[in-house]
């Protein structure tokens, strides 16, 4: 057992590293995709919807295989290390799910809060930062925590 401890420790550190980096990428992608899906410009909305539908509609294992085996082929020629493939695959996959969590949380804020922010003549950025996002984040925290636990469990595929 003692000779296996260094290997277990190394595997644990790799898992934590992949999970931490993937979580950061997933959070960034969730915010970007949510902003795209809620945009007024139709092509941006379409792009956000396409990202979410593609990454939620295919399994994580298929996506990881695609990133690792298909991207290095001639039309793309994008080669990544296994560590990078794990981070990108997990981050993009769970970012799509996180986008739906954020979108639902933003939609859960009562319309009266938007109207009150408009009545106070707050700028759109101030409205979002001071009034809407704090309430939405309270609603998004439990499912987002579950999603990050799923991401940690998803590292077993890499």
Q: Which residue ranges define each predicted feature?
A:
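Transmembrane alpha-helices and adjacent helix-loop boundaries
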Residues: 1-158
